[in-house]
Amino acid sequence: MRNLRRRASLAAAIGITALSLAGIPAQAGTGPSLAPTARTSAWTALPAAPVAFAAAETHKGARSAASGEPVCTAPYINEDQRLGPKSLPQKGVLGRILRTYVPLGGLPPQKFLDRYWDWSVNFYRFPPDFGFAHSGGYPNGRPLIASKTLRVGERVDRFGSENGAFLAPYGTPYEERGIPPTSLDTFPDSPEYPCNYHVYRVIKEFAVDFGPIASAFQQPGGGSQYHLVSRLIAEAPQNRDEVAVGWLVQNGYLVRLN
């Protein structure tokens, strides 16, 4: 039984990596369906344009203060990549973002997976309505979504690849973001982004869907999220509902800060 469980965990971990690299949005769910979809805008990756102070602050928290070992990589909780890394940053911006985060919300690993893992798609169940909170906190309440313009100079961030279509105000605590623990896993082929964390500055204003984040994955939510939608960005490809972060970088709306 133990070997079967380990094989199941390995298969699930492979599925996580494949879905993440395919561009599963990493900020919230993707609409009324509980299963996420890989909707991305076509773009070509550009060389990073790092800004020294942001990169230094982010990577300052890339190793555990206690052990000096790499963080946000193996070992994983319960030896299961789906549950996120055991070792998390304690310093820098990542340390501040994770300071009050309680992994799995204190649930035992198997109970957490039973509650939030969808075996039919081999990924997590996301809240409906793109992860936005509902009026009055009621499941049948109105989704709390408004339009907002991000101004030049604002800093935003995300946990997840640039194929995703969600951002948050810079430094939003992890437990307020409505994302699963696996979003903290550092991509093996992108070790320069510990915890899969990316920071950007707005260099050309654009509009987004904006609102509070629903509780999810045993975390309270309550932070703000920016959903990148093509109907609000005239220059974006209109054959998709969402706009990838990478497209905004390539087309001069965002600049990477780490």
Language-model regions: role of each:
Residues 207-258:
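Active-site or metal-binding loop neighborhoods of secreted/extracellular toxin and effector enzymes
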